[in-house]
Amino acid sequence: MDPLGAAKTQWPWRRCLAALLFQLLVAVCFFSYLRVSRDDATGSPRPGLMAVEPVTGAPGGSSRQDTTPTRHTLLILLWTWPFHIPVALSRCSEMAPGTADCHITADRKVYPQADAVIVHHWDIMSNPKSRLPPSPRPQGQRWIWFSLEPPPNCQHLEALDGYFNLTMSYRSDSDIFTPYGWLEPWSGQPAHPPLNLSAKTELVAWAVSNWKPDSARVHYYQSLQAHLKVDVYGRSHKPLPKGTMMETLSRYKFYLAFENSLHPDYITEKLWRNALEAWAVPVVLGPSRSNYERFLPPDPFIHVDDFQSPKDLARYLQELDKDHARYLSYFRWRETLQPRSFSWALDFCKACWKLQQESRYQMVRSIAAWFT
């Protein structure tokens, strides 16, 4: 009886000891979890990834290494400069305040550490398989196919099947939409002076560098100029020095923004820069009017499809030339909107922002099937 009675009196102390040990184990696990969570929240660099200072446009494409430990920032490699011409780059946070930065460089030595590689199609299309980044691809690295050229200027797309994760182009259905231009609201009062009609001393201009006699735009021009004088600039025509281009075009009331290729969303600097930045009313030949109106109000431009013939268009332009009120109606949109044009630096920052928002890893099965 005594041994059993003694055991009963010792049992509560054993239960207390077991409870204390259990609480100690829970506390150790909890504080270990807090430490891991805090480390994750600070964004410690992934092992093997060196932070590289953003390129500020150094012609050699090299980047200075920052030895100060920093929060991991996405590293984007430009496999080539666009058309093999170095361009000035800017901090993405400066281009759009409140956004995050990426490290962007054209230094191929960082290829093994790069989170993404932007491949400009024109620079690799002559022999894609030999000009693409090497295999094996670093784990998790995303490749971005980039082109601002229309399908006829993008050869050998079929050779790229299964290589790319994201598309980046002027097409609005691209993963990364990089148009040639756009309209955006004024942040305050319009910052431009009213249009000076007295400075518009000429009627119609057209600047063309790629003259193809059998193209749709040349055929239309030839029919139009039979009824209306058009000043043509470019190769084999009137010289137009780059330094005086906008000054020259701003003297004209109308500008022929004729695209060299007719494809959806292919609306280039011919409209956004040559016409709108010169304060000339664009006369457009390209995709349908409805396609233009996805990016512009209906009144800033004149579409050739609105007329039965080039002769009818010529007559309309001559009428507007004499009717100042009707001509000025093509500028009302400027009271609330302003035109913007693309830059390579901004396009690369758009890729930066997309990569930060979209972590899903996908594969584009066929660039050719989508783009052509």
UniProtKB/Swiss-Prot annotation:
Membrane protein topology class: Single-pass type II membrane protein
What's a GO cellular component annotated to this UniProt protein? Answer: Golgi cisterna membrane
Q: Which reaction does it catalyse?
A: a beta-D-galactosyl-(1->3)-N-acetyl-beta-D-glucosaminyl derivative + GDP-beta-L-fucose = a beta-D-galactosyl-(1->3)-[alpha-L-fucosyl-(1->4)]-N-acetyl-beta-D-glucosaminyl derivative + GDP + H(+); an N-acetyl-alpha-neuraminyl-(2->3)-beta-D-galactosyl-(1->4)-N-acetyl-beta-D-glucosaminyl derivative + GDP-beta-L-fucose = an alpha-Neu5Ac-(2->3)-beta-D-Gal-(1->4)-[alpha-L-Fuc-(1->3)]-beta-D-GlcNAc derivative + GDP + H(+); a beta-D-galactosyl-(1->4)-N-acetyl-beta-D-glucosaminyl derivative + GDP-beta-L-fucose = a beta-D-galactosyl-(1->4)-[alpha-L-fucosyl-(1->3)]-N-acetyl-beta-D-glucosaminyl derivative + GDP + H(+); an alpha-Neu5Ac-(2->3)-beta-D-Gal-(1->4)-beta-D-GlcNAc-(1->3)-beta-D-Gal-(1->4)-[alpha-L-Fuc-(1->3)]-beta-D-GlcNAc derivative + GDP-beta-L-fucose = an alpha-Neu5Ac-(2->3)-beta-D-Gal-(1->4)-[alpha-L-Fuc-(1->3)]-beta-D-GlcNAc-(1->3)-beta-D-Gal-(1->4)-[alpha-L-Fuc-(1->3)]-beta-D-GlcNAc derivative + GDP + H(+)
Q: What keywords does the record list, in alphabetical order? A: Glycoprotein, Glycosyltransferase, Golgi apparatus, Lipid metabolism, Membrane, Signal-anchor, Transferase, Transmembrane, Transmembrane helix
Write down a Pfam family by its short name: Glyco_transf_10
Residues that span the membrane, as ranges:
16-34
Give the EC number: 2.4.1.65, 2.4.1.152, 2.4.1.-
Which ranges does the record list as Lumenal topological domains?
Answer: 35-372
What SUPFAM superfamilies does its record include?
UDP-Glycosyltransferase/glycogen phosphorylase (SSF53756)
Which residue spans adopt a coiled-coil conformation according to this UniProt entry? none
Q: What class of enzyme is it?
A: transferase
The GO molecular function terms of this record are:
3-galactosyl-N-acetylglucosaminide 4-alpha-L-fucosyltransferase activity; 4-galactosyl-N-acetylglucosaminide 3-alpha-L-fucosyltransferase activity
- Glycosylation sites per record: 165, 196
Reply yes or no: does the keyword Lipid metabolism apply: yes
Which pathway? Protein modification; protein glycosylation
List the subcellular locations: Golgi apparatus, Golgi stack membrane
Residue segments, region Disordered: 40-68
Q: Major location, coarse class?
A: Golgi
- Residue ranges in the Cytoplasmic topological domain are 1-15
Q: How is it modified after translation?
A: Glycosylated.
Extract one GO BP annotation from the record.
fucosylation
What does the sequence similarity comment in the record state about its family? Belongs to the glycosyltransferase 10 family.
What this protein is reported to do is described as: Catalyzes the transfer of L-fucose, from a guanosine diphosphate-beta-L-fucose, to both the subterminal N-acetyl glucosamine (GlcNAc) of type 1 chain (beta-D-Gal-(1->3)-beta-D-GlcNAc) glycolipids and oligosaccharides via an alpha(1,4) linkage, and the subterminal glucose (Glc) or GlcNAc of type 2 chain (beta-D-Gal-(1->4)-beta-D-GlcNAc) oligosaccharides via an alpha(1,3) linkage, independently of the presence of terminal alpha-L-fucosyl-(1,2) moieties on the terminal galactose of these acceptors and participates in the blood groups Lewis determination and expression of Lewis a (Le(a)), lewis b (Le(b)), Lewis x/SSEA-1 (Le(x)) and lewis y (Le(y)) antigens.
Q: Could you tell me what this protein is called?
A: 3-galactosyl-N-acetylglucosaminide 4-alpha-L-fucosyltransferase FUT3
Q: Which organism is it from?
A: Pongo pygmaeus (Bornean orangutan)
